[in-house]
Regions:
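Short acidic low-complexity segments
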Residues: 1-11, 371, 376
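Short acidic/histidine-rich motifs immediately flanking catalytic phosphotransfer sites
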Residues: 10-15, 103, 381-384
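Structural beta-sheet core signal
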Residues: 84, 124, 162, 182, ...
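Active-site beta-alpha connecting loops in nucleotide-dependent enzymes
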Residues: 259, 283, 289-358, 365-371
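Glycine-centered, small-residue-biased loops immediately flanking beta-strands
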Residues: 158, 327, 384
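A glycine-rich beta-strand to alpha-helix segment
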Residues: 371-402
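Adenine nucleotide phosphate-binding catalytic loops in nucleotide-utilizing enzymes
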Residues: 131, 137-144, 158-159, 174-286, ...
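Phosphate-binding loop of NTP-binding sites
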Residues: 7-11, 20-164, 168-178, 233, ...
Length: 409
């Protein structure tokens, strides 16, 4: 559709809200500034929307979209009619936001540019803290300092819920002086998640032991993997912190249908299952592929599109190690997300790095889309799982590949 300064003149908005993806050169943003119209980051809008509600803000380098979606779904299935605004489409709702009539507001808190410091939360969830968005932050230490400020935003009556499997993150939370509840698979946490085998490969289950000693069975019928069981545990902890019925909350979580682009099944063709996933950071990739490895497919094949030159440059060795559980890896060109190319920072460079980390692994770099579909038709076999991964337009590859094979028959 495109953006046009004339839109601002026609609409005459009271305020313009921008996401982190909007550059200062955007014509509508420039026109708003010329007219002295207030310009708010997304998080300031979230803060305004949350006034009068009990606000649950979910943050973390990974898992915040899934966890906030789980919290919103859980509260809704408990008939509490929450409002929510999340960074992904919640399956079963076909939207990323809703204005409910209940007392709770669930907000996904974006740390990418520090704007989550505008929020005024009652409960904060932090799933993890790692090096990312190094186009904005100078170091991991600066990221941790910013998260500490974010966790401090909860008032004296508020609570910080944090994954304590990383003791440093738990220590950071406690340094704020706020009430902290830790969760994780380690028995030292306040809330313990014990994953167990489940008869359906695409499902996951765990036993959650709360601080009062009560245990609850949690079953997730989409989004496999221990990382998603931890996300579900975080949601259950939120219910417990809010004083809600934990058993009813665990039951409600079983109705979670997933988040679009988080291990979303695209389709099946010729014995091949195609899944799409938003993972674009080495830790996310590792977790998703570890979960995929346990699903019983002949091979786990991956098409990966790096997202941002700056991220690839900063984390190239971590990316090189991230694909251990992929049997076959196909790399396509970097999705710039508005960045200018960095000399030498390319998908071909990443291919060389992966080969160095995993000698003998099938790694290909394919620059063109038609060449990609042709290459995949040769690489992917019946019985394989094909995962398209990345935060860019790689999401279109799955449907295109299915169409390609359909028309080829």
């Amino acid at each position: 559709i495109g953006h046009d300064a004339a839109t601002i003149d026609a609409v005459k908005p009271d305020v313009v809200v921008v996401s982190t993806a909007i550059p200062e050169t955007n014509p509508e943003l420039m026109r708003a500034r010329e007219l002295d119209i207030p310009v708010w980051p997304r998080a300031k809008m979230l803060s305004e929307l949350g006034q009068g509600y009990t606000t649950i803000a979910v943050a973390g380098t990974h898992g915040k979209t899934t966890t906030s979606s789980m919290v919103a779904t859980m509260l809704d299935r408990m008939k509490l009619d929450p409002s929510f605004l999340i960074g992904g489409i919640v399956e079963g709702y076909d939207t990323n936001g809703r204005n409910g009539q209940g007392e709770y507001f669930v907000a996904e808190a974006d740390e990418s540019d520090s704007s989550f410091l505008y929020l005024d939360p009652d409960v904060v969830v932090v799933t993890n803290i790692e090096a990312d968005h190094l186009d904005h932050y100078s170091s991991l230490e600066e990221i941790e300092e910013t998260f500490a400020k974010f966790m401090s935003l909860v008032g004296e009556e508020g609570t910080v819920v944090v994954c304590g499997d990383n003791p440093h993150v738990a220590e950071l939370a406690r340094s704020t002086g706020r009430r902290v509840v830790t969760y994780g698979t380690d028995a030292a946490n306040d809330v313990v998640c014990t994953p167990h085998a489940h008869e359906h490969a695409l499902e996951g289950a765990c036993t959650v032991t709360l601080p009062d000693g009560a245990t609850h069975e949690v079953v997730i019928k989409s989004n496999p993997g221990t990382h998603n069981l931890l996300n579900a545990t975080a949601a259950l902890v939120v219910a417990w912190v809010l004083g809600l019925d934990a058993h009813a909350a665990a039951e409600a979580l079983s109705g979670f249908a997933g988040v679009r682009r988080r291990f979303t099944r695209v389709g099946d063709i010729d014995g091949i299952t195609v899944v799409d996933d938003y993972g674009h950071h080495p830790t996310e990739i590792k977790a998703t592929l570890a979960a995929a490895r346990g699903l019983g497919f002949k091979n786990v094949d991956v098409v990966f599109q790096p997202h941002r030159y700056s991220r690839l440059q900063a984390l190239v060795d971590d990316f090189g190690d991230a694909f251990a559980d992929a049997d076959k890896l196909v790399l396509i060109d970097v999705f710039s997300a508005g960045e200018m190319p960095i000399p030498g920072v390319t998908s071909k460079m990443l291919a060389d790095t992966v080969r160095a980390h995993h000698p003998g692994k099938s790694v290909s770099y394919v620059p063109g889309r038609m060449q990609l579909l042709e290459a995949l038709s040769d690489i992917v076999e019946p019985g394989d799982l094909l995962i398209t991964m990345g935060a860019g337009d790689v999401t279109t590859v799955g449907p295109e590949f299915i169409d390609y094979l359909t028309n080829k028959e």
